[in-house]
Regions:
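A membrane-cytosol interface segment of integral membrane proteins
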Residues: 155-191
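Membrane-embedded catalytic scaffold of the fatty acid hydroxylase/desaturase
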Residues: 1-166
Length: 193
């Protein structure tokens, strides 16, 4: 969440010569192509944005390897998270319908009027905690803040607990979602920050 928001959005918008500025180009391509970004089908050696993204992920994995002897399960979890992020993110931009149905929070990140929301990629729960989830009518929204398909009885409990723990977050999310819908109707696009 933090890395996406700060390193890939805020920093490159302030410093256009940042290697992460290629992420802004990714946003533009996704927006112009109804979420599709063909760059994810290319070799990392032929596409600067893919090169930067994969290099950062490889560096994160390599850098965390030092923790392996003292925190093997944490390190394995980090490796899995990096792999899962790449797999889900790449697949979603090559198959927009998959993204719209399976990771609607990320689809909404690119396709809403304000791309400065919905920072999570693989699961939306942190967007709920940080009050940055915005729902749209253009995706099929998740039915619980974990973003998992849960049995109905469990989903009801998860939603009830989440709304009890995060009432202000849910109110803010609802207000932001309504504002975004109005901006979409008016054709307003908020610039990336």
């Amino acid at each position: 969440w933090y890395a996406h928001k700060v390193w890939l959005h805020e920093y490159p918008m302030k410093y256009r010569n940042s290697p992460f500025f290629t992420h802004i180009a990714h946003h533009k391509r996704s927006r112009l192509n109804q979420f599709h970004d063909e760059g994810y089908a290319e070799s990392m050696f032929k596409n600067a944005e893919i090169y930067n993204e994969k290099t950062a992920l490889i560096a994160l994995a390599a850098g965390s390897t030092i923790l392996l002897p003292v925190a093997p399960f944490f390190t394995a979890g980090l490796y899995y998270g990096i792999y899962n992020y790449w797999k889900v993110h790449a697949k979603s931009h090559l198959d927009p319908e998959y993204a719209r149905k399976r990771i609607p929070w990320h689809y909404d990140h690119h396709m809403t009027s304000d791309q400065n929301a919905n920072w999570c990629i693989t699961r939306p729960w942190f967007d709920y905690i940080m009050e940055t989830r915005v729902f749209t009518d253009i995706s099929i929204p998740e039915t619980n803040p974990l973003g998992y398909d849960l049995p109905v009885w469990l989903e009801k409990r998860v939603n009830k607990i989440a709304k009890r723990i995060l009432p202000k977050a849910y109110a803010k999310i609802e207000a932001a979602s309504q504002q975004d819908q109005e901006q979409l109707r008016q054709g307003i696009e908020v610039p990336l920050s």
